[in-house]
Amino acid sequence: MDKQIYIIHENDEWIVPLREELKKINAPYKEWHMGRDKIDFSNIPPEGVFYNRMSASSHTRGHRYAPEDTILVLNWLENHNRRIINNSKALKLEISKQKQYQELEKYNIKFPKTFFCKDKNSLLENSNYFDKPFITKHNRGGRGLGIKYFNNKNELNKYVNGDQFEPSIDNTTLLQEYIVSDPQVITRVEFINSKLLYAVQVDATDGFELCPADPCNLEEKFCPANSDGNKFMIIKDYNNNKISKYQSLIKSNGIEIAGIEYIQGKDGQHYTYDINTNTNYNSIAEKKSSLKGMQTIAKFLFDELNQRTTKSNFSFPNLSFPSSVIR
């Protein structure tokens, strides 16, 4: 079998734009859906380029153990020295905000004050360290699902001891200071091939469930900075002195494609709070820019595949030397 691009994922809807871009450039590809497909680890994996697009929110789509299954696949591929985009180290960050924040701290990147709580008692005890509003957040999650806002410990107590309490799928809940953003936007910085592609501004006035993928953004709402009503807008001439730190962080963790989110507080400082290795792009925002996320990913994957195809097809010419020069 000829070499192909293998896309490892669990959400068909998010793959549609990538399929379209790969077809446009005639790139051979195959999908491994971790909610349906079975992988035989007794076999030697095929040759090619493997792109891991596993999502921390897979459990919300009925694929509870897809990340764990993907880790097994990535371990198998790595054991056979296959080329992987976003390897097993990257997946560990995708499914654990605790791991993300450890890496942010290592690279001296500011993030909100956060406690990682294993049970309800821990949540209530650590809330004593906040004298301002705070939020809860799942350690393994995505799109802001499960995030709740609290003004004080009494409100938290009613929540954790009530019927509406939502434990994280991995049993770890973050208790985090609420940063009042100024302006009311978040910024998502996109990287492909560990290089900056662009930054997108997201209107955050409506809450926490933010997802740049088109299926998540069908109902266009007014964004004060964007006259067409789309909540997502690519920032022209974006500049941020944290870019080099972001790049160092993702490179050291096997991440080549990512979206990193931060907000600016009223104190003027940037607070980074999420690293997404399963990144999506908003086509409406991209219409106003020459930069295209999925198009760039497709080209990157195809270039990587072609490099490996060229290397494997290369052979040294049949050269003969006088016996005197052979040692």
Question: Where are each of the predicted segments found?
Answer:
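Rossmann-like NAD(P)H-binding beta-loop-alpha module
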Residues: Y107-P133
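Short glycine-rich anion-binding loops that position phosphate/pyrophosphate groups of nucleotides
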Residues: S55-H59, N139-G141, N278
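Phosphate-binding site of ATP-dependent enzymes
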Residues: K148-N253
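Conserved anion/nucleotide-ligand pocket segment
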Residues: D131-Y159
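Conserved N-proximal alpha/beta basic substrate-recognition cap immediately N-terminal to
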Residues: E10-K113
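C-terminal active-site "lid" helix and adjoining low-complexity regulatory extension at the edge
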Residues: D237, K251-I255, Q264-R327
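Protein kinase-like catalytic core scaffold
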Residues: F134, L174, L197-Y198, A258, ...
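Extreme N-terminal starter segment of soluble prokaryotic enzymes
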Residues: M1-Y6
